[in-house]
Amino acid sequence: RMGLRGLCLTEHSGPWDLHEFRRFADLHNVVLIRAMEVETDMGHVLAFGMDEYQPGFHKVETLSKAAKAAGGFIVTAHPFRAVFSRPTFNRPLLYKAVNDELPVEPEDAMNHPIFKLVNAVEVANGGTADEENDFAMKVAGVLNMPVTGGSDAHSTHGIGRFVTAFRDEINNQEEFLAALHAGSFHPAVGLRTGELRPYTV
C-alpha cells in the first residue's frame, strides 16, 4: 500500500538467519536486505554487508576495520538522540559519561571520533526527535558526509516514516552495497502519504 518493494532489516546485535531470510523474501516476492544494528562504545551503528556478529564488535573501531575488510558499509544510527530531549534516566549514547559535555552547535559535535570510523550518518530516524534529526543533518553537512534515513520501526506502525531513497532500482544485497559505496542515495520523507521527497533541514 505504501509502494515499498524492499526493506532493510537491521536486527539488534546480529542479522537474521540467512536461510530463513531468503525463504521469507521469496515467499513474499520482496527485496529484503539483511543487516544488523550493533550496540558499540560509541552508540548504535548500522552494519551492512556483514555476515554475522563477531566478538569485539562492541568496539566501533573493531567493527569499522571488519566492515572495511568485508567490503561492508557502516552508519552511525540516531547519533544525537536524547541530546536535546534529555530523558531523565538516559544519557545520549555518544556522550555517555556524566562529565561529557553535550553539543550545542554542529561544530561542537563534528570532532567526535565516531565520524572518522563510519561511512555515513543517519539523519532522519523515525524514533528520534525532529530537533535531533535536524542537528545530525547539520553536523553531517559540516563534515560533508553521506546521509541516510530509516524508520527505526519495531512494528508495522512506524514503517516508512523516513527512508533512504536510491537513484537506481535495488534488486539484491550486492546492488544495495554498491549503491551505498557509490553514494547514490539520500534520506527521504513522505512515503506514507505518497509524496516522497528528499529530507532537508
Describe each model-derived feature in a short phrase.
Residues 57-61, 77-78:
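Ordered, amphipathic secondary-structure segments that act as subunit-interaction surfaces
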Residues 10, 36, 77, 151:
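Active-site flanking residues adjacent to catalytic metal/cofactor-binding acidic residues
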Residues 2-4, 15-30, 38-55, 65, ...:
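Charged catalytic cores and adjacent phosphate/nucleic-acid-binding surfaces used
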Residues 33:
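General small-molecule cofactor/ligand-binding pocket signal
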